[in-house]
A protein has these predicted regions:
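Acidic, metal/ion-coordinating pockets
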Residues: 24-281
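N-terminal Sec-pathway targeting helices
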Residues: 1-13
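Hydrophobic alpha-helical membrane-insertion segments, chiefly the h-region
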Residues: 14-25
Length: 281
């Protein structure tokens, strides 16, 4: 991991009504200094309304989520906050089936996401329909292990993107799960794909050593187990933000990469009930 961007031990899965977090003792003295805040969510699945809990309380919802994001941007400075979605923002409620997935794009735009990756359910209505929807999206879409260049869809998807936040140059690579078992073969068989480990190593090396990024993030939709395997087969990745398995991680998990370095992995459950928050100094 590049030492100029150390992942601070302040990892929280956050209920919208309040933010909880802690600074590890080793770096507690740095908590008052401005730095990069990463907010991440995954597998929202067209859930726009709060979930009713057994005790009668409400959890999640896009209005509450947007309010939480805005509160963090006000507190930390919008220029210091990176907001990402790890895929499957589509499918899972009548909003998607009745409105053809347009509302999901409107919500992503209104909330001001900086970058998203694709999940398998983004393809439920086909390649051409996904292209139509993404043409209205205001942020980069990253996916490195599929080749969409022969489709209209290819205009809206790149293997990686580079952003500047909190004075740091940040490279974000997208990795999508094997679609052959989760998407109709009439769709999947039209899309060439690459080995996920090879393309991750290729672009991570490029972002680290050619673009001189301070931080290299893999934004994935391959599941928690897939994230661990990805880390163990790659290098030059500083952080993995995952989705697909709906795994609720209330703390960072770590896996060693090819160089024997611990790489943190995070994921924030599903349905927009929680956001993850990461502080980088």
């Amino acid at each position: 991991m590049k030492k100029s961007a150390t992942i601070l031990m302040i990892i929280s899965i956050i209920f919208f009504a309040f933010a909880i977090g802690f600074c590890g003792a080793r770096l507690a003295k740095d908590c008052g200094r401005p730095g990069l805040t990463i907010l991440h969510v995954n597998d929202t699945h067209s859930h726009f309304e709060p979930v009713l809990l057994e005790e009668g309380n409400l959890l999640g919802g896009v209005v509450e989520g947007a309010a939480f994001v805005d509160s963090v941007r006000r507190k930390d400075g919008a220029e210091n906050v990176l907001l990402v979605h790890a895929g499957d923002f589509s499918q899972g409620s009548s909003y998607f089936t009745e409105l053809n997935g347009d509302l999901e794009i409107d919500v992503l735009n209104a909330t001001g996401y900086d970058v998203v990756t694709l999940g398998n359910h983004e393809f439920d209505n086909g390649i051409e329909e996904l292209a139509r929807r993404l043409s209205s999206l205001n942020c980069p879409v990253v996916c490195a292990n599929y080749d969409f260049s022969t489709f209209e869809l290819g205009k809206y998807i790149t293997p990686y993107t580079i952003l500047e936040k909190a004075g740091k140059k940040i490279g974000v690579i997208g990795v999508l799960t094997d679609l052959r078992s989760v998407v109709d073969r009439s769709i999947v068989d039209r899309i060439p794909f690459f080995d996920a480990y090879e393309v991750t190593n290729k672009w991570a090396d490029y972002l680290r050593n050619t673009e001189k990024c301070d931080l290299v993030i893999c934004l994935t939709h391959i599941g928690y187990g897939g994230d661990r395997k990805l880390v163990s087969n790659t290098r030059n990745v500083d952080l993995v933000i995952g989705g697909h398995s709906h795994t609720f991680l209330d703390k960072m998990e770590y896996e060693k990469n090819l160089d024997g370095e611990d790489v943190p992995i995070v994921q924030a459950g599903c349905w927009g009930e929680y956001f993850g928050q990461i502080k980088v100094k």
